Amino acid sequence: MSGQPKRLMVMAGGTGGHVFPGLAVAHHLMAQGWQVRWLGTADRMEADLVPKHGIEIDFIRISGLRGKGVKALLLAPVRIFNAWRQARAIMKRFKPDVVLGMGGYVSGPGGLAAWSLGIPVVLHEQNGIAGLTNKWLAKIASRVMQAFPGAFPKAEVVGNPVRTDVLALPLPQARLAGREGPVRVLVVGGSQGARILNQTMPQVAARLGDAVTIWHQSGKGAQAEVQQAYAAASQPQHKVTEFIDDMAAAYAWADVVVCRSGALTVSEIAAAGLPALFVPFQHKDRQQYWNALPLEKAGAAKILEQPQFTVDAVSETLKGWDRATLLEMAERARAAAIPDATERVADEVRAVARA
């Protein structure tokens, strides 16, 4: 039996912030001979994405409870019980040595199912403040890890697994030291874009003129509108794209990033070694603010919360960052990164499987 490969079930779903770090760990362990299956939901992004990465996926039926009506809340215990039962049946068939919860609604019933079968549960919290599912599961988990300090008081800080092409970028000194000309500003609103970035940055471009050149990722369906906004501000020379397929190339091009502060974005910016101006998404638990705070404290970034993200404030901030300052901030960002996060998470999974 000792010669048989170890088996891991990854539980993650809903958003790229949960799924992509899970994929990084899965590939790392598969390269070492592990068998990996995924637990997800059929109507979220993991259903298409995970099989494209050569990983088989099983589905349970579960969704979030926030913002749902009274009827949905009353039915919630039944739905959670049914999802737990589905997850139990899947795990009885696959017989994982360990399950890894990377967040999303699927982790709740999946983690409870594993615990009820005596399968150890390992958790990774990507955000600076713990999600509801992970708060519950932490009580039964064999090991809890966090990307940023503060989500769990005693958990080890291991960073977020990021893509290898971002980790492979040259260090800031090699990339940025000899640059001249306009400051290259990369504006990223995520795959859905960010309305405040799309509305504010064309006016910032007009204010800063030849001092900057901008590459603006508008998000789905907003490219024409944002191009029009730059043209209306007499700034048609700036590049606007709906999506950026090669983020590593975009980071390599940039001198500074203006963006939301989702967990994966913050971790990628640190790994790339880039200064950032963050505008956290306004959420009641201020999750994105807490994600960005370590880089601001390190002197690698500035946070402007949405009410403060005005044309004046953004223009003055960018104007105040000369090339020497940007290079110093970039080096501080890289120093704050945890480039071996994937290996650290995989090591914890291996240790729990051996125990």
Swiss-Prot record:
Gene3D superfamilies (alphabetical): Glycogen Phosphorylase B (3.40.50.2000)
Catalyzed chemical reaction(s): di-trans,octa-cis-undecaprenyl diphospho-N-acetyl-alpha-D-muramoyl-L-alanyl-D-glutamyl-meso-2,6-diaminopimeloyl-D-alanyl-D-alanine + UDP-N-acetyl-alpha-D-glucosamine = di-trans,octa-cis-undecaprenyl diphospho-[N-acetyl-alpha-D-glucosaminyl-(1->4)]-N-acetyl-alpha-D-muramoyl-L-alanyl-D-glutamyl-meso-2,6-diaminopimeloyl-D-alanyl-D-alanine + UDP + H(+)
GO biological process, one term: carbohydrate metabolic process
Pathway: Cell wall biogenesis; peptidoglycan biosynthesis
GO cellular component, as recorded: plasma membrane
Enzyme Commission designation: 2.4.1.227
Membrane-related topology note: Peripheral membrane protein
InterPro entries: GlcNAc_MurG, Glyco_trans_28_C, GlycoTrans_28_N
Domain of life: Bacteria
Family as reported in the entry's similarity comment: Belongs to the glycosyltransferase 28 family. MurG subfamily.
Protein function: Cell wall formation. Catalyzes the transfer of a GlcNAc subunit on undecaprenyl-pyrophosphoryl-MurNAc-pentapeptide (lipid intermediate I) to form undecaprenyl-pyrophosphoryl-MurNAc-(pentapeptide)GlcNAc (lipid intermediate II).
Name of the molecule in the record: UDP-N-acetylglucosamine--N-acetylmuramyl-(pentapeptide) pyrophosphoryl-undecaprenol N-acetylglucosamine transferase
Source organism (scientific name): Cronobacter sakazakii (strain ATCC BAA-894) (Enterobacter sakazakii)
